[in-house]
Amino acid sequence: MKALILVGGYGTRLRPLTLSVPKPLVDFCNKPILLHQVEALVKAGVTHVILAVSYMSDMLEKEMKEQEKRLGIRISMSHEKEPLGTAGPLALARELLTENSEPFFVLNSDVICDFPFEDMVRFHKHHGKEGTIVVTKVEEPSKYGVVIYEAESGRIQRFVEKPQVFVSNKINSGLYIFSPAVLDRIQLRPTSIEKEIFPVMAQEGQLFALELQGFWMDIGQPKDFLTGMCMYLQSVRHKHPERLHVGPGFTGNVLVDPTAKIGQNCSIGPNVTIGPGVTVEDGVRIKRCSIMKGSRLHSHSWLQSSIVGWSSSVGQWVRMENVTVLGEDVIVNDELYLNGANVLPHKCISESVPEPRIIM
């Protein structure tokens, strides 16, 4: 089977991390976001992954060449010369997608969840129509486009964009499976699959919904990235508890790379990921944070709800909170307070940031 992953966006909502690498290569729980998706696809029997690329495509290509060998699959690049929206990339990759008559997966690149790829194949073959959308239940449907469908069959009747009164709490999760016939509906031009293609398919009875069991998060911006991390760690707790770190000073779900060094008298967790080559000095407190590869947290620093980008350094007695994000190679001097700071790569911070703002 094949899968197309839409990785062409600029990832502006996840800056400053995406100023160093394209969003699909940002480390989420110690592994690039894209790799979480690709590994789940391979497990479900996908042998050919196509990446619809534009921004920083060289970096993606280099990383995925290595993964191609490791996973023993074929990975192709489909290069967009101009932004083609969410449907145009399907038309661009048409030749690759129609090498056989099998259905194929399409994924948005920001989605992290309990990927239900095997269930999708079964359900899609069962109803035999052109398309299947995975839907997920949300608390606040008024922020999204919701999907209205028959509970018994899953046949989608219509879509309602950001409803002000309650009509449904199921939204499009950004995971699809299509039969090749769907490509006859899509032209090679900028097109929105959600607004231009899906409503017509639904009218013709060609689109079905499968409800996701398990967690789901669009991790395209820092606060959702951290929420998604908490959900993912809870899922690891259920499925692979042996991967979580336990011991004195550790609380709740904590993922620590074996190459990281942790000092004495630290308090780490709940909901923390510590990447490869990270050094955490004595007396550090970390809660609900992602600490990326090669970073150093100096003694007695206190971090909550923050993301520390690759190779950054946080000084002694620093306090960071409220979705503070450090880009790559940032230095925070000793005894400073960062509240909701968004710090661009290669900066040195020498004074406190008491109110949320971008440091350029």
Curated annotation (Swiss-Prot):
GO molecular function: GTP binding; mannose-1-phosphate guanylyltransferase (GTP) activity
Pathway: Nucleotide-sugar biosynthesis; GDP-alpha-D-mannose biosynthesis; GDP-alpha-D-mannose from alpha-D-mannose 1-phosphate (GTP route): step 1/1
Enzyme class (EC, first level): transferase
Name of one Pfam family that matches: GMPPB_C
EC number: 2.7.7.13
The keyword Acetylation is assigned to this record: no
InterPro entries, A to Z: GMPPB_C, GMPPB_N, Hexapep_transf_CS, Mannose-1P_guanyltransferase, NTP_transferase_dom, Nucleotide-diphossugar_trans
Role summary: Catalyzes the formation of GDP-mannose, an essential precursor of glycan moieties of glycoproteins and glycolipids.
Name under which the protein is recorded: Mannose-1-phosphate guanyltransferase beta-B
